[in-house]
């Protein structure tokens, strides 16, 4: 623990410790208010970056413990210098502050630590951070660093990690009164194994074709070959394309005269179309587009001032991160860049990645890659929505719709244990879960609670982790919080009006859909400003009641798994189902609210939750088929509808439509973004359109993983690998592949909680050949394409020809 230590204020802390006796080992237990880095005798300690991570600012901080023996001088009487640098990230930072308010910005950063020394005679000493043995000052070269702002670095200043010069006595910090817990999930690392080199680079100076309506097109003066040294002069702009959008930092090897300032500006996309303003461009064609970052002039910056180096020097930011594919570089004097790379930043390490799936279709493979890169980018301390703009928050619906997909690509159990603590920290006294966790600039205010599909992540995520990993601990940790939530929505029937004091009389609902009712576009609100349409309230209540039913069903599953009262939640689920049937559905399968019958998402929830059967189900399925046909075999769903779209179609005998949607290339579709050069999943189906340009710039991310939830269906239907809740953690595997010749083949391998599961199929003429493998100790229920009878297979490798 950290007993006996104090929080010390300032942003550079140094303590010189004289060894009373010979040291055999040393551990340093640390945390901070703000992003902190540790140094012993000038050596950086620990591989994790952006410590202590994103948590509820007032309730929880994570601690990191390091074995530092190898960095010490161990002999008796020797002196060792311990130093810490703290910057505002995650604490005195805009990410914590409500938009437009001062809030936490400018709050005092602090450090807390305990050094445990073990001497050669077996005795121990504990040295805590305090105001008497530590000195503090203003950090040297790091002039400013924060999550949204970026980093400003002046290499002319000495780091000062090995000296007490220019330091004074620190203050004692009393601002944090929460709990300090050991870090165990959500740590952030550089992904050196994924380092990206330039795929294209060019210098431009001046523009042509500029007019009142257009910024014109850049004049390219030089294109650089791979590995070629790049030189930037004043008045020139260097554009570097790394070929992959991701959360990352640029890493330089460069040289310039002392005092030269280099400015690096990241972006996700380039301006095009002669910089036409009508297309949403913010500069000439070929320049970096930054308008979608929302603070392009004041945020997401990287400024570096050179010291008096006679040779090349290296630099990469350590105290922030960016979301980008491109960078734009300018300088006020000549800068020679021998090397530049983009180093991805993620909480998903190489060792955590568990699954790979490939097909014979290049576009589908790119979609899978886009999804994986979206997860790498957005599983960053918390499951964020996007890594690039002034947001980067733990949006709860984004998290729940993607959670199961994410478990196939990586072992996310510890990551979600950590995040569910953030959820509990942000839960309201009534039991309502927030729209964002942990508490941040918005999305978790007292009127951002009980948002349908968002709040439900508090139940859905633990259920997914339990199902996929066989992890009952996450149920135990969250049971009281989940019960409180279910009791709350059960008492109110999850009714929008009954909860309006908590939900702000607004719902995000099926966010960014193309349906007739959709919150973001204003189609829930009358154009004359008269307020929300009655049909919208009906829609919100219909969707929330479906989540009430889903939540209750998941609670009954988790209750059975842990020896709790499942009957209570089975009864609650039955109550929710009857409520939906009575209030929203006619006996023939038509919705009582007429506009629902023209939409996809209402029908999908009805089919998923088995609200209709017999003729009523046939009628609903026909309407749904007709709806897809009317829209040219295009989906119309948003965040919530898309999350259940493909599995629901498949479970209800409409896998043919699911495959049509997968292969669709018109807007809206998954492959539309792929055809338009996407390397990650977009926030909107139309974040960019070849004919119209950029989507709405106030909210337009090109790295937003939610729609990557289609990969859950790819794993479970294309490859035919899914977990059975009767024996979770893939001890009992459901293997039910549904192939399509347009894929040519599928190769999938998943290192599950039960061991490695393999599923590979291909077509040879009219023959379908399936090879699959079941790990030792597991059992698979195998259903072949076109059949309904499942057969049990034990551990081993098999081939079936059909």
Locate the predicted segments by residue:
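Non-catalytic C-terminal accessory modules of carbohydrate-active enzymes
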Residues: 103, 107-110, 114, 128-165, ...
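Short helix-capping and inter-helix turn/linker motifs at the boundaries of alpha-helical repeat units
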Residues: 240-242, 318, 393, 452-456, ...
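C-terminal capping/lid segments that line or modulate ligand- or cofactor-binding pockets
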Residues: 82, 153, 390-391, 409, ...
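Helix-terminus loop motifs that line ligand-binding clefts
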Residues: 47-58, 269-295, 413-530, 669-692
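Extracellular/oxidizing-compartment recognition motifs
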Residues: 5-6, 10-389, 414-415, 437-439, ...
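Active-site acid/base region of carbohydrate-active enzymes
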Residues: 35, 129-138, 334-370, 376-377, ...
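Alpha-helical support elements that line or immediately flank enzyme active sites
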Residues: 26-27, 249-268, 327-330, 398-427, ...
């Amino acid at each position: 623990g950290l007993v006996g230590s104090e929080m010390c204020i300032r942003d550079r802390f140094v303590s010189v410790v004289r060894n009373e006796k010979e040291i055999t080992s040393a551990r340093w237990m640390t945390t901070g208010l703000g992003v902190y880095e540790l140094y012993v005798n000038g050596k950086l300690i620990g591989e994790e970056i952006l410590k202590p991570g994103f948590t509820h600012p007032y309730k929880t901080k994570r601690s990191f413990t390091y074995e530092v023996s190898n960095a010490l001088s161990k002999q008796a009487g020797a002196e060792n210098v311990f130093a810490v640098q703290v910057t505002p990230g995650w604490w005195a930072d805009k990410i914590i502050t409500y938009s437009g308010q001062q809030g936490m910005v400018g709050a005092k950063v602090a450090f807390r630590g305990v050094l445990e020394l073990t001497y050669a005679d077996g005795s121990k000493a504990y040295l805590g951070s305090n105001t008497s043995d530590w000195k503090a000052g203003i950090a040297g070269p790091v002039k400013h660093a924060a999550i949204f702002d970026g980093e400003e670095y002046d290499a002319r200043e000495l780091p000062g990690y090995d000296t007490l010069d220019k330091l004074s006595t620190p203050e004692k910090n009393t601002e944090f009164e929460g709990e300090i817990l050991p870090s165990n999930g959500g740590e952030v690392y550089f992904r050196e194994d994924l380092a990206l080199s330039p795929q294209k680079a060019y210098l431009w100076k001046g523009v042509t074709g500029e007019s009142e309506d257009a910024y014109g097109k850049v004049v390219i003066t030089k294109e650089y070959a791979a590995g070629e040294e790049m030189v930037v002069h004043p008045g020139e702009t260097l554009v570097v394309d790394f070929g992959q959008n991701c959360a990352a930092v640029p890493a330089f090897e460069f040289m310039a005269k002392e005092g030269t300032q280099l400015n690096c500006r990241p972006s996700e996309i380039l301006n095009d179309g002669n910089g036409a303003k009508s297309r949403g461009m913010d500069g000439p064609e070929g320049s970096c587009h930054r308008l979608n970052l929302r603070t392009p002039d004041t945020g997401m910056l990287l400024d570096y001032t050179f010291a008096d180096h006679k040779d090349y020097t290296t630099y990469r930011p350590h105290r922030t991160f960016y979301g980008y594919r491109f960078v734009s570089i300018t300088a006020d004097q000549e800068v020679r860049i021998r090397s530049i790379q983009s180093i991805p930043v993620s909480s998903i390490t190489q060792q955590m990645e568990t699954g790979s799936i490939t097909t014979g279709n290049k576009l589908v493979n790119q979609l899978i890659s886009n999804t994986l890169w979206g997860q790498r980018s957005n599983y960053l301390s918390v499951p964020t929505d996007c890594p690039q703009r002034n947001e980067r928050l733990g949006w709860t619906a984004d998290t729940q719709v993607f959670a199961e997909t994410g478990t196939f690509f990586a072992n996310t159990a510890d990551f979600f244990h950590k995040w569910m603590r953030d959820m509990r920290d942000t839960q309201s006294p009534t039991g309502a879960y927030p729209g964002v966790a942990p508490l941040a600039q918005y999305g978790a205010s007292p009127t951002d609670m009980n948002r349908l599909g968002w709040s439900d992540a508090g139940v859905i995520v633990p259920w997914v982790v339990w199902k996929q990993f066989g992890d009952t601990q996450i149920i135990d940790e969250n049971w009281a919080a989940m019960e409180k939530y279910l009791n709350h929505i059960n008492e109110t029937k999850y009714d929008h009006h009954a909860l309006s004091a908590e939900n702000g009389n607004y719902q995000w609902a099926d966010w960014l859909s193309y349906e007739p009712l959709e919150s973001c576009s204003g189609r829930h609100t009358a154009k004359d400003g008269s307020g929300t349409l009655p049909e919208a309230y009906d829609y919100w209540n219909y969707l929330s009641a479906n989540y009430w039913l889903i939540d209750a069903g998941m609670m009954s599953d988790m209750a059975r798994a842990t020896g709790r009262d499942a009957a209570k939640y089975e009864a609650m689920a039955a109550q929710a189902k009857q409520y939906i049937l009575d209030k929203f559905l006619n006996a023939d399968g038509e919705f009582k609210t007429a506009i629902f019958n023209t939409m996809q998402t209402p029908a999908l929830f009805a089919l998923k939750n088995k609200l209709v059967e017999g003729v009523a189900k046939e009628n609903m399925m026909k309407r749904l088929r007709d709806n897809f046909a009317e829209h040219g075999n295009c989906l119309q769903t948003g965040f919530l509808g898309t999350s259940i779209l493909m599995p629901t179609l498949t479970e209800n005998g409409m896998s043919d439509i699911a495959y049509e949607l997968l292969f669709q290339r018109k807007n809206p579709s998954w492959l539309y973004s792929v055809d338009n050069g996407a390397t990650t999943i977009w926030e909107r189906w139309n974040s960019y359109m070849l004919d119209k340009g950029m989507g709405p710039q106030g909210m337009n991310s090109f790295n937003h993983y939610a729609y990557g939830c289609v990969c859950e269906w790819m794993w479970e239907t294309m490859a035919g690998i899914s977990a059975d809740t009767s024996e979770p953690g893939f001890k009992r595997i459901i293997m039910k592949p549904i192939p399509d010749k347009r894929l040519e083949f599928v190769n999938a391998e998943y290192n599950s909680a039960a061991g490695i599961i393999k599923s590979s199929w291909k077509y040879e003429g009219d023959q379908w050949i399936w090879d699959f493998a079941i790990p030792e100790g597991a059992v698979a229920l195998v259903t072949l394409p076109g059949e309904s009878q499942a057969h049990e297979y034990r551990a081993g490798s098999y081939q079936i020809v059909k």
